[in-house]
Amino acid sequence: MSEARKGAYSCSFCGKLHSEVRKLIAGPRVYICNECVELCSGILQEEGRPARQGGFDLKPPEIKQVLDEYVIGQEHSKKVLSVAVYNHYKRLRNSGVISEVEISKSNVLLIGPTGSGKTLLARTLARVLQVPFAMADATTLTEAGYVGEDVENILLKLLQAANFNVEAAQRGIIYIDEVDKISRKSENASITRDVSGEGVQQALLKVIEGTVSSVPPQGGRKHPHQEFIQINTDNILFIFGGAFDGLEKIIEARNRGSCMGFEANVQKIADKRKDILCYTEPEDLVKFGLIPEFVGRIPVVTSLGRLDEETLYRILVEPKNSLVKQYTKLFEMDNLELKFDNAALLAVAKKAVARNTGARGLRAIMESLLLDFMFNPLGCEGGKVVVDAAMVEDVMMSRNCFESG
């Protein structure tokens, strides 16, 4: 089928000459080059591979079981997230089956103080489900045309996480942190433009509800003439997180003077911020500064509590990638044995509670505690480092004091 061109044979599929390829395989009146063979082989392998289901078939208890391996505490939030994610991907899996009923998307809002595990929950979910995951900071977002990131940049991050596989990205998870920082400045509409508050909420509305967005693959503002990638956000799960400092006061004010039983309950637990946040209603979020349309598109709301000493201690030792296991492995790389006694770990947890930084503060304390040993591992006697409570107190005290001279 392929004739000699000036005495040279060519591939019957791609048309490349014999001199342009590494190998040309001859058949009855046809030829195929090594490049086309490799391409065909890849196609056959991909088609023969069983469809990757990821975690789509996991039931809520199974999802929570995996979350338990990485996230300590926050039992109610893990249960809420497991059900929300299960329902979301069940909806996707049966999208071609159910025609008479259209099931809406259930985006999620996580309310909790810094270091309570909001980001870790979202990241672990993406790992469980084996779907592309992107994380964004709401404080960097502005309306289109202003200095800052466009909303489309979040979708670009998801595309990058999916290696620009649009179909995979359209089933991914986007976590937007610090969403409480884009609350509008007051409940009343302002005559001035709020480009980083209400303006961002307005820009996010269509994206989180479901629309076809034009995403610039190289970023929107520096390359205005590039080709855009169309991405449908109907099936992207959005998870929002924020500390919402001051929300508990709004909840208390709403319930002051209402039902005696509820008010008594609120007063009883007034010192436990997490318990108060359990009573969050959409109207409280609107009062805080989220616009009603935005709140309406996030039907699943759950709160995470501030972590106590016992939970922080468990975080140090129990997760698959706990800090104790991480630092033990780091020291093993220098042929050193690292040991902590329980009193030392409890002291570290106590310091984290005092700093009010939650689980995020544990690493900073551990870094400070082990700094000298990591700086000069050869100075460790007998190839062993044993950390006790007295060492924790001494090191943290010296770090908190000004050096003289």
Curated annotation (Swiss-Prot):
Any one of the GO BP annotations: proteolysis involved in protein catabolic process
Keyword Metal-binding in annotation: yes
**Pfam families the record matches:** AAA_2, ClpB_D2-small, zf-C4_ClpX
| Domain ClpX-type ZB, chain residue ranges per copy | 1-52
Record-level Gene Ontology MF annotations: ATP binding; ATP hydrolysis activity; ATP-dependent protein folding chaperone; protein dimerization activity; unfolded protein binding; zinc ion binding
By its UniProt entry, which PROSITE patterns does this protein fall under? CLPX_ZB
Q: Which residues cross the membrane?
A: none
Is Amino-acid biosynthesis a UniProt keyword of this protein? no
**InterPro entries in alphabetical order:** AAA+_ATPase (IPR003593), ATP-dep_Clp_protease_ClpX (IPR050052), ATPase_AAA_core (IPR003959), Clp_ATPase_C (IPR019489), Clp_protease_ATP-bd_su_ClpX (IPR004487), ClpX_bact (IPR046425), P-loop_NTPase (IPR027417), Znf_CppX_C4 (IPR010603)
GO-annotated cellular components: HslUV protease complex
Q: What highest taxon heads this organism's lineage?
A: Bacteria
Where along the chain is Zn(2+) bound? Answer: C11, C14, C33, C36
Function summary: ATP-dependent specificity component of the Clp protease. It directs the protease to specific substrates. Can perform chaperone functions in the absence of ClpP.
Entry similarity comment: Belongs to the ClpX chaperone family.
Note the subunit structure: Component of the ClpX-ClpP complex. Forms a hexameric ring that, in the presence of ATP, binds to fourteen ClpP subunits assembled into a disk-like structure with a central cavity, resembling the structure of eukaryotic proteasomes.
Instruction: Supply the name of the protein.
Output: ATP-dependent Clp protease ATP-binding subunit ClpX
- Origin organism is Anaplasma marginale (strain Florida)
Upper classification of the organism: Bacteria, Pseudomonadati, Pseudomonadota, Alphaproteobacteria, Rickettsiales
User: Gene encoding this chain?
Assistant: clpX
